[in-house]
UniProtKB/Swiss-Prot annotation:
It comes from Mus musculus (Mouse). Induction: By all-trans retinoic acid (ATRA). Monomer. Involved in both glial cell differentiation and axonal network formation during neurogenesis. Promotes astrocyte differentiation and transforms cerebellar astrocytes into radial glia. Also induces axonal extension in small and intermediate neurons of sensory ganglia by activating nearby satellite glia. Was called meteorin because it can transform glial cells into cells with an elongated trail. This is Meteorin. GO terms for biological process: axonogenesis; positive regulation of axonogenesis; radial glial cell differentiation. InterPro entries: Meteorin-like (IPR051998).
């Protein structure tokens, strides 16, 4: 009995050491192999950063990944995952306070370019990675990048977060347009030059001719100059069916993994009407210069 107990403790110690050895120096990323994991076991991982990467080679068993430290915080948070291709050998779920698991990433040819979801206040920010069974032993890698954001815009509709959340294709209401103009990572006035579709990533890339950068929190866009027109790329979901259209638009959205993702895109004239009406009734969330 004593020998069995010692062997069990030794195995647990080796698994913990193996998982620990897979951490990057800043403990923002982890790389490990299922070949060192006991069948049916659940490895425990904690990444203290708000962005990083996971690379799980030859997935086996399961991993439970806690993001951003052990304290869930008092504000809602948003996690976005972007899989590396080919993503194979595992599924990724988000743990919910109810005990349910919400599927975020799964292997297969229809895997979209990424997914975001929201955790509520005090909800533990944990992901559950489960290996999928395969009969052969060919090399499989389940790898993805993650970003964790504090959700300061809980009143925004789901499509404001971009990158594959439910409802991402419906138009924004007038109230959502006004709030997006005040809280988005970027607000630019421009026209659509073209739209390219990526069926593999299930994304559409909108090429925008930038007339004016009204606001941005990151240096994603540059205005046109005397040397030529400034152009920018904004991503959205392929299933939204974006097509080139005439006229000027106000593009608003978020930065995800260093890329611009579309939230709301009303015609500039339409937004001007909504904003003017809000100014008249003193219901505008913020002031902005449209001229």
């Amino acid at each position: 009995m004593l020998v069995a107990t010692l062997l069990c403790a030794l195995c647990c110690g080796l698994l913990a050491a193996s998982a620990h050895a897979g951490y990057s120096e800043d403990r923002c990323s982890w790389r490990g192999s299922g070949l060192t994991q006991e069948p049916g076991s659940v490895g425990q991982l904690t990444l203290d950063c708000t962005e990083g990467a996971i690379e799980w080679l030859y997935p086996a068993g399961a991993l439970r990944l806690t993001l951003g430290g052990p304290d869930p915080g008092t504000r809602p948070s948003i996690v976005c995952l972007r899989p590396e291709r080919p993503f194979a050998g595992a599924q990724v779920f988000a743990e919910r306070m109810t005990g349910n698991l919400e599927l975020l990433l799964a292997e297969g040819p229809d895997l979209a370019g990424g997914r975001c979801m929201r955790w509520g206040p005090r909800e533990r920010r944990a992901l559950f990675l489960q290996a999928t069974p395969h009969r052969d032993i060919s090399r499989r890698v389940a790898a993805f990048r993650f970003e964790l954001h504090e959700d300061q815009r809980a009143e925004m509709s789901p499509q404001a977060q971009g990158l594959g959340v439910d409802g991402a294709c419906r138009p924004c209401s007038d109230a959502e347009l006004l709030l997006a103009a005040c809280t988005s990572d970027f607000v630019i006035h421009g026209t659509i030059h073209g739209v390219a579709h990526d069926t593999e990533l299930q994304e559409s890339v909108i090429t925008v001719v930038v007339a004016r950068v009204i606001r941005q929190t990151l240096p994603l866009f540059k205005e046109g100059s005397s040397e030529g027109q400034g152009r920018a790329s904004i991503r959205t979901l392929l299933r939204c069916g974006v097509r080139p259209g005439p006229g000027s638009f106000l593009f608003m959205g978020w930065s995800r993994f260093g890329e611009a993702w579309l939230g709301c895109a009303p015609r500039f004239q339409e937004f001007s009407r909504v904003y003017s009406a809000a100014l008249t009734t003193h219901l505008n969330p913020c002031e902005m210069a449209l001229d």
